[in-house]
Amino acid sequence: MIMLNIGPFSFHSRLLLGTGKFPDFDVQQKAIDVSEAEVLTFAVRRMDIFDAKQPNLLEKLDVKKYTLLPNTAGAKNAEEAVRIAKLAKASGLCDMIKVEVIGDDRTLLPDPVETLKASEMLLEEGFIVLPYTSDDVVLARKLQELGVHAIMPGASPIGSGLGIVNPLNLSFIIEQATVPVIVDAGIGSPADAAFAMELGADGVLLNTAVSGAKDPIKMAQAMKLSIEAGRLGFEAGRIARKRCATASSPLEGMSVVE
């Protein structure tokens, strides 16, 4: 398969995995291992990365094996998002940042105006910017025009498990994209992840679908395989949809024994 390229980074795996809500660290680590994810995301605000006395994800993971993608979860405006991103950078983490500016506490949908503003400000600061956005086609294009390094449209609200509720809009975003499209949020099953890849997405970022599963380790493996299958299917090219049947076996040139 073709590698996933985001800014200066190249990855074999197209599964980006969140690190929150796992039952315990052992389950988390095993799930990460079987997923073969190379990019791990986490909320900067949920860790005291400057306090050595406070245990956190970075202490327990072999961070040299992964590319870390800190996110600005908890930010309510562009200024807060930029502040969180700078905190992550100052701690020595990757310059790549997932911009997350929530505009509605009930749906956890992103604020389009503040997301645009934060993305522009962080690009000016030299960050590799991956904004979490809705399935708004125009907003995705405007983010792309700013120069972001990937676009991360939600399939449905964060943690909902509803899957891809608007595949048409998602397909429009993918068709117009000149940067990678990573489907983020709302994935609930391996079928959802495979569908995203079949639509032409470059990758899938998920967390709750794995960490909240009855068996997170098995689900991590299932997501890995479904994303690989969906991508292979997209690269192979599906047959055209037709209204009428077409015989799969040739009828001409066959001798009929009476």
From Swiss-Prot:
Major place of residence: cytoplasm
Catalytic activity: [ThiS sulfur-carrier protein]-C-terminal-Gly-aminoethanethioate + 2-iminoacetate + 1-deoxy-D-xylulose 5-phosphate = [ThiS sulfur-carrier protein]-C-terminal Gly-Gly + 2-[(2R,5Z)-2-carboxy-4-methylthiazol-5(2H)-ylidene]ethyl phosphate + 2 H2O + H(+)
Cellular component aspect of the GO annotation: cytoplasm
Pfam families: ThiG (PF05690)
One example of a Gene Ontology biological process annotation: thiamine diphosphate biosynthetic process
Enzyme Commission number(s) from the entry: 2.8.1.10
Associated pathway: Cofactor biosynthesis; thiamine diphosphate biosynthesis
InterPro entries recorded: Aldolase_TIM, Thiazole_synthase_ThiG, ThiG
CDD domains from the UniProt entry: ThiG
Keywords: Cytoplasm, Schiff base, Thiamine biosynthesis, Transferase
GO molecular function annotation: thiazole synthase activity
Keyword Acetylation: no
Active site residues according to the UniProt entry: 98
Compartment(s) where it occurs, according to its Swiss-Prot or TrEMBL record: Cytoplasm
Chain sites annotated for binding 1-deoxy-D-xylulose 5-phosphate: 159, 185-186, 207-208
Domain of life of the source: Bacteria
UniProt-listed Gene3D superfamilies: Aldolase class I (3.20.20.70)
Leader sequence residues: none
Function statement: Catalyzes the rearrangement of 1-deoxy-D-xylulose 5-phosphate (DXP) to produce the thiazole phosphate moiety of thiamine. Sulfur is provided by the thiocarboxylate moiety of the carrier protein ThiS. In vitro, sulfur can be provided by H(2)S.
Family label: Belongs to the ThiG family.
Assembly behavior: Homotetramer. Forms heterodimers with either ThiH or ThiS.
HAMAP family noted in UniProt: ThiG (MF_00443)
Name the UniProt record assigns to this protein: Thiazole synthase
Organism: Bacillus thuringiensis subsp. konkukian (strain 97-27)
Gene: thiG
